[in-house]
């Protein structure tokens, strides 16, 4: 579930995070450092709730108790607060595209799920990541998706890591 990084491991993680933040800044992403606790309204607004409520860490209460809009949860992904920065806004075409990156620790209870698709993976309840969030006009979403793929590939290529791209059905 949880782990310590010490010495070289801790330095390596910090270096990789900084490297990715620098690369994405070069790619035109604006950095955001969002809050770690988020409210239920934000979780619902990004599709995390009700589907993933059992995977979330609630602050000050159990997941089996009813929750209201103001209850707080540990961040499952930076997408929740970053997209909710615009929850009350109308984004006009001239404001787009908007490209944000956010480094955050993330918390999920799903660590116990195992199966053939997770063979060889170690699942944990807390992990760090640099998230990319893009807002574009609907007609540009496919092009932006391919742009995101290229931006992720650039990180892997600059690190000299081998990779492959899989096209998978999610529906």
What is the meaning of each model-derived region?
Residues 1-171:
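TRNA-recognition modules of translation machinery and tRNA-sensing kinases, especially anticodon-binding
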């Amino acid at each position: 579930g949880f782990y310590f990084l010490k010495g070289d491991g801790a330095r390596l993680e910090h270096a990789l995070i900084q490297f990715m933040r620098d690369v994405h800044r070069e790619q035109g992403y604006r950095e955001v450092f969002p809050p770690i606790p988020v409210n239920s309204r934000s979780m619902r607004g990004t599709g995390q709730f009700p589907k993933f409520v059992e995977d979330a860490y609630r602050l000050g209460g159990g997941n089996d108790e009813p929750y209201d809009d103001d209850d707080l949860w540990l961040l499952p992904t930076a997408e929740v607060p970053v997209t909710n920065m615009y929850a009350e806004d109308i984004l006009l075409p001239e404001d787009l595209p908007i490209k944000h990156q956010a480094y955050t620790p993330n918390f999920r209870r799903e660590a116990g799920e195992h199966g053939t698709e997770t063979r060889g993976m170690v699942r944990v309840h807390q992990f760090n990541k640099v998230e990319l969030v893009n807002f574009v006009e609907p007609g540009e979403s496919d092009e932006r998706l391919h742009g995101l793929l290229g931006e992720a590939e650039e990180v892997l290529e600059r690190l000299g890591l081998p990779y492959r791209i899989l096209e998978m059905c999610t529906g």
